[in-house]
Amino acid sequence: MARVCQVTGKAPMVGNNVSHANNKTKRRFLPNLQNRRFWVESENRWVSLRVSNAGLRLIDKKGIDEVLADLRARGEV
């Protein structure tokens, strides 16, 4: 699927634009996705991921090795 974070699974959600007159029209809220390369020291190679900003923060917190292990356990990488 397009526009889905590979780490967190965040995807677009649907909501409303609300005008001053309280008119509502449908819109999509897109996740803040970034294409990033991460150096994996244990494999001695670069890994490219499409991650949201929340996914980047999770990688900073847990480390790329642990996040990649979770992705491989889910069968996504």
Swiss-Prot record:
* Pfam families xref list: Ribosomal_L28
UniProt KW keywords: Ribonucleoprotein, Ribosomal protein
Query: Where on the tree of life does the source sit, at the highest rank?
Result: Bacteria
Cite a single GO MF annotation: structural constituent of ribosome
Q: Name one GO biological process term.
A: translation
Q: Which GO terms describe its cellular component?
A: cytosolic large ribosomal subunit
InterPro entries in alphabetical order: Ribosomal_bL28, Ribosomal_bL28/bL31-like_sf, Ribosomal_bL28_bact-type, Ribosomal_bL28_sf
Q: Where is the signal peptide?
A: none
For this protein, the record's NCBIfam families field holds: L28
User: What family does this chain come from, according to its entry?
Assistant: Belongs to the bacterial ribosomal protein bL28 family.
> What name goes with this protein?
Large ribosomal subunit protein bL28
